[in-house]
Amino acid sequence: MSDILDKIIAVKREEIAAALESAPLEELKVQASARDSRDFVGALRDKHAAGHAAVIAEVKKASPSKGVLREHFVPADIARSYAQHGAACLSVLTDERFFQGSARYLEQARAACALPVLRKDFIVDAYQVLEARAMGADAILLIAAALDTPLMIDLEAYAHSLGLAVLVEVHNRGELDEALKLKTPLVGINNRNLRTFETTIDTTLGMLDAIPDDRIVVTESGILSRADVERMEAAGVHTFLVGEAFMRAENPGAELARMFF
């Protein structure tokens, strides 16, 4: 199979070049400074302290591997449904080319509820970090497979300077070793291989022994049932990023409650 991640990164670099023309850095800085901030990490810890799973509920219309997940897609309604049914935070896809996402979707979802919001995208440049703050994100995703370690460290530092939390995502032990050089407590283990899009939740279970106790493990992708949730919780994982299972349900928030609470 062709390397999907490399294709996505190449497109991101093209998008950044175009965005710099249409929305210069100084303009973005003004927009970013006007945004309020919600505590992403704190929202997860509050759920843990109350004895609940912390669910980062995803607002996602489509994916390259599965196509359109939800035809009737209204981000504000989905966000409200998640908030009403116990989500800790939101994750909103902003990639347009591959996931049919949009910055507008993030803005609409955040305006509809009080939950902190993660910008889910393929970030490879500081411009996108500032862009995330300007659109209202409270956290960004850094994907270890897409970044070398010095750049990842620099992007994290810039994000923190803007008041953004960082979720660093890994898929194997080599990436984990590099991710642990960051300061963020949030370590996401993606059960989906971003180079092949194959998925198994054993990926998370096989890496837990290498993660320090002071980090919050976020299991991502492939959590599709209550049985998957119970398997993770039995292994000590209590933070989940889930999209597909909710997006395919008639009522995303009700499905969240059914799976987790």
UniProtKB/Swiss-Prot annotation:
InterPro entries: Aldolase_TIM, Indole-3-glycerol_P_synth, Indole-3-glycerol_P_synth_dom, Indole-3-GlycerolPSynthase_CS, RibuloseP-bd_barrel. The keyword Cytoplasm does not apply. Its EC number is 4.1.1.48. It catalyses: 1-(2-carboxyphenylamino)-1-deoxy-D-ribulose 5-phosphate + H(+) = (1S,2R)-1-C-(indol-3-yl)glycerol 3-phosphate + CO2 + H2O. Gene3D superfamilies: Aldolase class I. It comes from the Bacteria. One of its GO terms (molecular function) is phosphoribosylanthranilate isomerase activity. The keyword Flavoprotein does not apply. Pathway: Amino-acid biosynthesis; L-tryptophan biosynthesis; L-tryptophan from chorismate: step 4/5. SUPFAM superfamilies: Ribulose-phoshate binding barrel. Keywords: Amino-acid biosynthesis, Aromatic amino acid biosynthesis, Decarboxylase, Lyase, Tryptophan biosynthesis. One of its GO terms (biological process) is L-tryptophan biosynthetic process. HAMAP family: IGPS_B. Belongs to the TrpC family. This is Indole-3-glycerol phosphate synthase.
